[in-house]
Each structure stands twice: as C-alpha cells, then as structure tokens.
Amino acid sequence: MKRTQSLMVWLLFFALMLSAGMATAAVHFTQNEFTTAESLDPGMTQSGIHFTLGDHYKSYYPEIRYGLGAMLEIGVKFGATSVTIEDRDKLGVLVGIDLKYQLIKEADGVPLDLSVDVGFDNTVVNSKNASEVTFSTVMSKSFALTDRGYKIIPYGGLEMSALYGSLVDESDTSVYVLGGIEWKLSQKFMLLLELKAGASTLGGAGIRFEY
C-alpha cells in the first residue's frame, strides 16, 4: 500500500512539473535526456535507440552508456535530425556526449537517487550548426514489480540549457523541467518515455538493452 501511494505521489509531482513547463513554447534545438538518477555499475553497458519529437524537428539516434565507476557514467549518441526550415524538411546529423555523476544513492533511510549531468549536443544541417550545452539535476526512485529485477523508475528534474550556433537566430539560455519513466520489462530490456518542457515542449521514447 505504501509503495502504491509513493508511486502516485511521484506521478502527480511529474504531472505538475510538466504542466507548469508547458506555459511557453518556441523553436529550440534540444533533446530528451532519457536517464534516471542511478548510475551504471563499473563496466556495465546500455545501448539502445531513441526518438525525440520537438517543435519543427525530429531526432532519431542510437546511444551507448557505460559505467565508469566511482558513481560516474558516460553516454554517447550519434544519429539524424529532420528539421523544418522555411516549410521544407532538411535532414541533418546529431552528435552528443554527456557525463553523469550520482550524488545520492537510494538505500535504507534514503528515499531516492540524485545525480547531476553535463551534456553537449550538436545538430548540423546544411553546414550550419546548433550546439547545446546542458546541466541537469535528476532525481528518481525505483519501484520493484517482482523479485526478479523487473521494476519501474519514475524520474524528473531541472535542466539549464545554453544554445548557440549558426542554425539558431540568436544564442539563448533556457530552463527546462523534465519527467519520465524507465520500465524494465525484463532484467536486460527496458522502455523509456519522457516529456520535457520549457522554451519548447518535446516528447520522446526509447528502448535499451543492458549487458
């Protein structure tokens, strides 16, 4: 009963965050985070495919994440972005990297995980680029569904984004709120859903394998 109540509180919290963030919307090249606050164990790897639908652009990219140890985790992405420019769809390249450090680990007496993440994404279309530097604070909590490792992990947080480059009208700094769910459908396979809102609103989904 307590687990069900806690899960409902988390879902309500994310709904309030996202509804607040949807108050404004504008074109802004940014990507979903697709990460909980929990860092991978040393030597563990996750790889998967993600899709982001933003305002006037869509991104499709594979990503690999690797546990470095000492609560550190690194992620690398490389894929494609379709951008609507002057009513025409243009295809471009998306590359990115991020580094996550877990500050707090969930345990007895500690109700959640907390981490910080620094990232860099670069979108290149027609020899023009939109580069984004992000700093995120993410918190999450695991809810075990069975005793075999299947679980659901709601997560959310705040992100500071600095956008610049020749593909954007002017350099800009924005604040986003994000919320999502990682659902481990098996011990090695998971589904991710996320909504992110601030200067623009975007949503996305992804699948990952862990090994």
Regions inferred by a protein language model and the residue ranges of each:
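Glycine- and aromatic-enriched membrane insertion/assembly motifs of diderm outer-membrane
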Residues: 52-123
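Generic detector of solvent-exposed, compositionally biased contiguous segments
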Residues: 22-34, 89-100, 175-176
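Broad structural signal for hydrophobic residues in well-ordered alpha-helices, predominantly aliphatic
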Residues: 14-16, 64, 181
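Cleavable N-terminal export/targeting peptides
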Residues: 1-41
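Short beta-strand-initiation
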Residues: 11, 59-61, 176
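Outer-membrane beta-barrel transmembrane domain signature
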Residues: 26-56, 82, 107-109, 119-203, ...
